Amino acid sequence: MASLLDSVTVTRVFSLPIAASVSSSSAAPSVSRRRISPARFLEFRGLKSSRSLVTQSASLGANRRTRIARGGRIACEAQDTTAAAVEVPNLSDSEWQTKVLESDVPVLVEFWAPWCGPCRMIHPIVDQLAKDFAGKFKFYKINTDESPNTANRYGIRSVPTVIIFKGGEKKDSIIGAVPRETLEKTIERFLVE
């Protein structure tokens, strides 16, 4: 390990450009000033990143000037959360019969778990579909950790799983986080029947 550290050299971005020379006639060293070339550093401020141009003039222990030129670009934009989203209600085992099996319109049920990453990806899609198909379709979510009886009854082995019920019967199921278009086409297929 010691031999490895001995062989590694690290270049410094700023070194003090001080050239001291001692003349034979005086005991005080003379100092020459040199301008250091600008260095660029990546700077983060919230969701923006930019390169900062830092310029320094150095002298022996006095007057250091720093100029920072900033110009940024957005690294990541936050999603618009101001739109009123439809919150799809959660179901429990006790509500299953009346809300899903006895429904007069088709029902889409999303089986999910709080620890499931793909479930969090599909939640906004199901919420948006509930808004788009309001009145034509009912939408519910059921937490498989809190309602294991219903999940076992329908053989849910992986989450997210979306099941469509019509007339109290299971008609179709989709396993995994799928694109919105896949869910939309499946819903539309049951609207024309």
Swiss-Prot record:
GO terms for cellular component: chloroplast; chloroplast envelope; chloroplast stroma; chloroplast thylakoid membrane; cytosol; thylakoid. The record marks G117, P118 as: Contributes to redox potential value. One of its GO terms (molecular function) is enzyme activator activity. It is found in: Plastid, Chloroplast stroma. CDD domains: TRX_family. The active site is at C116, C119. The keyword Metal-binding does not apply. PROSITE patterns: THIOREDOXIN_1 (PS00194), THIOREDOXIN_2 (PS51352). GO terms for biological process: negative regulation of catalytic activity; positive regulation of catalytic activity; regulation of carbohydrate metabolic process. It comes from the Eukaryota. Residues 1-82 form a transit peptide. It holds the Pfam family Thioredoxin. Keywords: Chloroplast, Disulfide bond, Electron transport, Plastid, Redox-active center, Transit peptide, Transport. Thiol-disulfide oxidoreductase involved in the redox regulation of enzyme of the oxidative pentose phosphate pathway. Under reducing conditions, inhibits the glucose-6-phosphate dehydrogenase. This is Thioredoxin M4, chloroplastic. It comes from Arabidopsis thaliana. The lineage of its organism: Eukaryota, Viridiplantae, Streptophyta, Embryophyta, Tracheophyta.
